[in-house]
């Protein structure tokens, strides 16, 4: 269920266990495994109480990461490396031109993982709307941030179906979060063509640049995203219902109509 639901505590309350300022570390371009090892090190220190909350901002070289629910049919056919990870979800791609943010924070008690995910989504929605994608929102039953098929992208090369702009994948251990969110900025969509991204085969993926018809760099997207994320975690930005219904896949609809026509012809 992706639509907001009543959280375990008031929506205007911080979801963090600490009110100390967050540390933001900009890692530049870093290999996925190295960044994952760094996350694990920080998360262990945070759980032990020897480290405060940290947000890592990073860009990865091209790589696929497979979450715990990845299926064999999701896997790539282009030979690019796949790293099995301990987050939720299925397979996705990370790479050049994609802004990746890993909040490593201690969640307030009682831990509400769903509320945490919704706050991450809300931050992405707020940021991409501020950048100009005014119809960005949620699809019920699917995580992440989407643009509906009823919205035409400024770049005609953009996909036409419902399309995902921001992806989420998290892990919470001992009340401390790992992994996080990825926002497509200037990246190519080529690598998504070789996988079933997030296990979804009836929708597409897009970028801020395609949606707005101009180059939207990671540097441009970073400031509004981090600002919205800090507000969402603190409770200043509350989760709202930006949910829209998933549009039927036109190819599947056409195939079903053809199947029904063949069946009707055979019955005559």
From Swiss-Prot:
Q: Which residues bind substrate?
A: 87-94, 167-169, 180-182
Q: Which PROSITE patterns match?
A: BPL_LPL_CATALYTIC, LIPB
Q: Which residues form a coiled coil?
A: none
- Under which EC number(s) is this enzyme classified? 2.3.1.181
**First-listed, main subcellular location of the protein, grouped into a coarse class:** cytoplasm
Tell me the superkingdom of the source. Bacteria
Q: Which reaction does it catalyse?
A: octanoyl-[ACP] + L-lysyl-[protein] = N(6)-octanoyl-L-lysyl-[protein] + holo-[ACP] + H(+)
Q: Which UniProt keywords apply?
A: Acyltransferase, Cytoplasm, Transferase
The GO cellular component terms are: cytoplasm
Against InterPro entries, the record matches this protein to: aa-tRNA-synth_II/BPL/LPL, BPL_LPL_catalytic, Octanoyltransferase, Octanoyltransferase_CS
Sites annotated Lowers pKa of active site Cys: 164
A GO BP annotation: protein modification process
Localization terms from the record? Cytoplasm
Q: What does this protein do?
A: Catalyzes the transfer of endogenously produced octanoic acid from octanoyl-acyl-carrier-protein onto the lipoyl domains of lipoate-dependent enzymes. Lipoyl-ACP can also act as a substrate although octanoyl-ACP is likely to be the physiological substrate.
Cite the HAMAP family for this sequence: LipB
Can you tell me which family this protein belongs to?
Belongs to the LipB family.
What protein is this chain from?
A: Octanoyltransferase
List the source organism.
Corynebacterium aurimucosum (strain ATCC 700975 / DSM 44827 / CIP 107346 / CN-1) (Corynebacterium nigricans)
Q: Which gene encodes it?
A: lipB
């Amino acid at each position: 269920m992706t639509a907001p639901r009543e959280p375990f505590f008031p929506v205007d309350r911080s979801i963090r266990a600490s009110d100390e300022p967050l540390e933001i570390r900009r890692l530049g371009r870093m290999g996925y495994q190295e960044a994952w090892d760094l996350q694990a090190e920080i998360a262990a220190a945070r759980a032990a109480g020897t480290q405060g909350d940290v947000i890592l901002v990073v860009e990865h070289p091209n790589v696929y990461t497979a979450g715990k629910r990845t299926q064999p049919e999701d896997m790539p056919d282009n030979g690019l490396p796949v790293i099995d990870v301990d987050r939720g979800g299925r397979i996705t791609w990370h790479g050049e031109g994609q802004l990746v943010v890993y909040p490593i924070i201690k969640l307030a008690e009682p831990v509400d993982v769903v509320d945490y995910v919704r706050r991450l989504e809300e931050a992405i929605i707020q940021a991409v709307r501020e950048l100009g994608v005014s119809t960005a929102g949620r699809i019920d039953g699917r995580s992440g941030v989407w643009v509906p098929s009823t919205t035409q992208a400024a770049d005609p090369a953009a996909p036409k179906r419902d399309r995902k702009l921001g992806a989420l994948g998290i892990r919470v251990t001992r009340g401390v979060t790992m992994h996080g969110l990825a926002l497509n900025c200037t990246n190519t969509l080529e690598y998504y063509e070789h996988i079933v991204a997030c296990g979804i085969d009836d929708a597409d993926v897009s970028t801020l640049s395609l949606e707005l018809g101009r180059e939207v760099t990671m540097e441009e997207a970073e400031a509004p995203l981090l600002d919205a994320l800090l507000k969402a975690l603190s409770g200043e930005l509350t989760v709202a219902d930006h949910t829209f219904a998933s549009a039927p896949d036109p190819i599947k609809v056409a195939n079903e109509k053809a199947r029904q026509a063949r069946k009707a012809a055979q019955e005559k």
